[in-house]
Regions:
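Accessory alpha-helical/coil subdomains and C-terminal extensions
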Residues: 1-122
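C-terminal non-catalytic interaction/assembly regions of soluble proteins
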Residues: 86-214
Length: 214
């Protein structure tokens, strides 16, 4: 995202980045929390596109480089709308392939920008990141943790233990019943972590929070 921010700043544009997230907005929330974007829209909350345009134009105006960034979950939808799909073709789980919300947001932001930019249109850079979010060179932790998980999983099998999930608990390797992840969907708690008016993450304190916050 930092490379794309440079492009947006050079041309003083709005930058729309579409990322994974069919039902949950963690892939948009965490980078925004880390400073990769000014705003984010997520599946857990239907956003007002005009409010988003207003906020991004304000962000751009106050930025010395004259650009602003929004991260868009692929499963996000605007007020009164629904999820957008590329086609009716479904995967092996019956899910239709998502696509189009980033394009919609980009077009609407450009059309609405004169209202919040003294009548002048702001052009938009629209980029669907897709698998680029999951790419990158592994660091030491990326190599050590899966090696440990694999060995621990084999240990469980050798002991005849099934239906268990290898986990990190309080910084130490452990295992737990697998239904802790299969019994429900993990979604962003918008009352706790998402400001629905400002369209970005919020938090009260980092004290005693898990490492990844959400």
């Amino acid at each position: 995202t930092h490379d794309l921010r440079t492009c947006a700043g050079s041309h003083e544009r709005l930058l729309v980045l579409e990322v994974f997230g069919r039902y949950a907005g963690f892939s948009a929330m965490l980078p925004t929390l880390a400073g990769a974007a000014n705003r984010c829209v997520i599946p857990e909350y239907q956003f007002d596109i005009e409010r988003l345009a207003e906020l991004l134009c304000q962000d751009r105006y106050t930025n010395p480089s004259k650009y602003s960034v929004v991260l868009v979950s692929e499963g996000a939808s605007y007020s009164g709308g629904q999820m957008m799909f590329q086609s009716d073709e479904a995967d092996m789980f019956g899910h239709k392939k998502l696509g189009g919300i980033g394009d919609y947001v980009s077009n609407e932001l450009k059309n609405l920008s004169p209202k919040f930019n003294k009548g002048e249109t702001i052009n938009v850079i629209n980029q669907k990141l897709g698998y680029l979010v999951r790419c990158g060179n592994p660091d030491a932790m990326d190599s050590i943790v899966p090696m440990a998980y694999g060995n621990l999983a084999l240990d469980l099998i050798s002991k005849g233990m099934h239906g268990r999930l290898v986990i990190l608990r309080n910084g130490r390797y452990d295992n737990a019943p697998i239904d802790i992840v299969t019994s429900s969907k993990k979604l962003v708690d918008i009352n706790k972590f998402y400001n629905t008016d400002r369209l970005r993450p919020q938090y009260n304190s980092f004290e005693f929070m898990p490492q990844m916050i959400l």
